[in-house]
Amino acid sequence: TPSDLFRDWEDRFYIADSGNNRIVVTDSGFSKATRIYDKLKTADGETTLKDPEGIYVSEETQCMYIADTGNSRLLVCDLDGNVQLELTRPDSTLYENETFKPQKVVVDKAGNIYMVLNNITNGSAMFNSDGEFQGYFGANSVDATAEVVANYFWNMIATDEMRANSSRNVA
């Protein structure tokens, strides 16, 4: 089952095929698979993917970034399938969740890695190019003030007409 798709600078498509535990590379017309990554080389042998849900390929680093969801990790591999870096659950006070399930991944030109993680609402988890957890990027928390709670309650009981006539306050 395809769960993500990435088009590279040479018009190749990388497909995260989560149902078959692999990354499939096709030509620009999707007419043939030019490469299948189902086993990746590690320093001590090889590893397999399990339910990969995200793929990103960087022209700058010539690496694939694979959200290997079922194995609770993100793999950084060269285009020959050699694992360069493995990111797992951060050992940080900022990361409070028990699980680490990367679903989608992107990388900026500086090499920073941004991951959407299952059950994380703090934003995208950000790692530097060395794999060190930097915190979250994107979402800010909303303090549950009396006004926020009152607005939430009001929206639960208000009719569509009442909501249409009300104004929205953004601080």
Which role does the model predict for each range below?
Residues 1-171:
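Eukaryotic scaffold repeat domains enriched in small/polar residues
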